[in-house]
Amino acid sequence: VSARPHGSARRGRDRKAGVLMPEPGRARFEYGDAPSAAVVGGGIAGLAAATLLAERGSRVTLYEREESLGGRLAGWRTRLADGSEATMSRGFHAFFRQYYNLRGLLRRTDPGLTRLTPLPDYPLRHSGGLTDSFARVPRTPPFSALGFVALSPTFGWRDLATMDVRAALPLLDVRVPEVYQRFDQVSAVRFLERVRFPEAAHHLAFEVFSRSFFADPRELSAAELLLMFHIYFLGSAEGLLFDVPDEPFPQALWGPLGDYLQRLGVVVRTGTYVHDIHPRDGGGVALRTDTGEDRHEAAVLALDTRGLRQVVAASPGLGTAAWRDGIAAVRTAPQFLVSRLWLDRPVRPDRPGFLGTSGYGGLDNISVLERYEGEAARWAARNGGTVVELHAYAVAADAEREKVQSMLVDRLRQVYPETREARIVDARHEWRSDCPLFPVGSHHRRPTVRTPHPWLTLAGDAIRCDLPVALMERAATTGFLAANALLAAWGVRGQVLWTVPRTGRSPALRALGALAGR
């Protein structure tokens, strides 16, 4: 990573954003010499890899087991009890401004990102009645931290004085991969205890950061928590500002991107399950699907945790024993629930589009969809109602699902009392357990983009890359990195990638951060 090269287009407002240049090479394949590449998985990572490979002239086939693109951000049609149709999905996702590479992918079909709409705040409400807001907090560190302390009702100057400053100093200079070497053996909870982070403000760390991994913070690696603080708060000048799609995911994002890929010549094979892959004697790779065997010169596996484990386990010719053990050790986070309710009356006009919650017995956030999504707004306008979405993360494996679903509705009525008299026109409850878990001590075992085979790369939010990225941005970044690695081997230049700064933002902050290691 180097400073921004002269004349390049910076993707955000942060002048200290890092840039990763691709290996030098020719601009694209010449007609007739383009290799064939398989991309297995049609989520963000696979879409990024397929996009870049196709843009450089590779002959790409994209395999996706579901009937639509988008992976964990896919959507599907459902008919409601009132006879209308709606698009259901896995629900609210925040497209933060520092998601440079994901936003770059979306710019392929929406150069001005007009299909994303900003939400003005990221409020967090505690059951004790206090609400934290980031709307008025300065965006550039260290003023963001100072401004938050000055404005927060749950974290004040007095709390700052009780913290173990030396234990907190590593937050000021997070570096990848060094942060994992220092903190991967510690849990997120244990780190906050060491810092003496105020108990009343624990929800700030857990709801904003660690719960975003769908994980119990007692299991989550502290290195991931520090990385999240760096990406969203202490390392980036983009701030905790984000956008959301103004229509459901298929209409706003994946439909246009799928059309773009097909115009580039990509063969998109949805509804196609890849059972196994194996090296070909003459070079390249063969994939076995329900319809037969397909041959390619290279492949990107851009699968979720369970899919990656299954394909590798069924493909004995892949990798080394140590590499296969690393894949087998990839863990899945606990199950979570997304409940969407169509109600016959509106919530109060001042209710935000998104509200993080803490202390409400399992309810992690509430979204009011008509505040930002056109389809929900049209339903609400026709029916005089509202569309709300409730999330519960890290639900116990033995929990009774119907009780959890009822509990979320009860919590909604507690947080937004005006919903107590509302009739539920219809509801959908999505239970999933397919997100990666990053437990204490796991970083060194995680699979990387490069594999023992030069013709095979991995991508996805479970895949390790030594860059300060997480969640959807890790998926997009590893997708581009996977394509870059294959292109470099073929002598073709890949794509420039952007990240938040890879160290503390200033010499003073880096010097303070270094004190903790002495």
Positions of PLM-derived features:
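C-terminal segments that line or cap access tunnels to active or ligand-binding sites in enzymes
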Residues: 296-298, 303, 307-446, 452-457, ...
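Mobile amphipathic helical/loop "lid" adjacent to a hydrophobic cofactor/ligand pocket
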Residues: 10, 102-103, 107-108, 113-226
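Conserved FAD-binding subdomain of flavin-dependent enzymes
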Residues: 81-117
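Extreme N-terminal leader/targeting segments of oxidoreductases
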Residues: 1-37, 55-56, 78, 508-518
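N-terminal Rossmann-like FAD-binding beta1-loop-alpha1 element of flavoenzymes
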Residues: 32-62
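C-terminal lid/capping helical subdomain adjacent to the catalytic/cofactor pocket in oxidative enzymes
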Residues: 3-7, 27, 441-518
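Helical element adjacent to the flavin cofactor pocket in flavoenzyme catalytic cores
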Residues: 228-290, 294-298
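Glycine-rich FAD pyrophosphate-binding loop
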Residues: 54-81
